[in-house]
Amino acid sequence: QEHIFSKVWVPVFHKSELSEKGNFRTGQIAGQNILAYNDGNRIKCYKNYNVHQVSGTMQAPLITVEPELHCEVKHGGMVWTTLDPNPTMSVEEWTCGAFDCIADAIDTEEMEVFHYHKAVIDTNYKLWHDTNSEFYHDFMHYFNRVSGFNDEYFARKNIPFDNGHVNVSSFTVNYEEYAGFEDRGELSFPNLPPNQWYMVDLFPGYNFNLRGSAYRSDTVTPLGPNKVLIEFLAD
């Protein structure tokens, strides 16, 4: 946590969770509690020692002696922050082009979070991240096999970027091949061909899935050598 997760930009929240003045959201980076707050002009982030609610609206302006953490809103409205007091790169410099493949889809229209879920998993955070970036685990999922195993699927490539990031080239998901499902082409994101699927994996453990009709972000927080907190946001 100290040597890796406290040094990088972390996609902690989505701006739709902080859409109005006074809205706040709490979370954690590298074992330290943080708070994001909409002051009416922009979203600010601080270390958090006093607010115990997950989210809400403050009736009075936030007053704190804590120094403001570096904070940016980028890549589909995600709120990024870092515990590093002197980051050497902006968020766009840090992500280094990994989002270019989906930028026109996630930045064209405003998005809104409709689901949040978290889980504590008994595994090393590296193993979880590897599962999100490799292809073989799809063979264990019936839905993935019947809806996605086609020539495009097997032609995909992991495309590497600086700073340890990768993205996975797209393929067409045939949702109608799964019993009870229908084609989702009409629900696809703007500037995205119907039923496409893209994935962006960021070092050290952040994953973004664009499945045509929904955009999901996964963040990991190591809790121990073999325990990890995983948080999911769906837009």
Question: Which role fits each region the language model picked out?
Answer:
Residues 1-49, 71-72:
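N-terminal pre-ligand scaffold of iron-sulfur
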Residues 18-19, 35-43, 69-235:
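C-terminal catalytic domain of Rieske-type non-heme iron oxygenases
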Residues 9, 22-24, 60-62, 200-208:
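Short, hydrophobic/aromatic-rich segments at coil-to-beta transitions
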Residues 44-62:
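A generic, well-ordered mixed alpha/beta core segment in the N-terminal half of proteins
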Residues 66:
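Phosphate/diphosphate-binding loops
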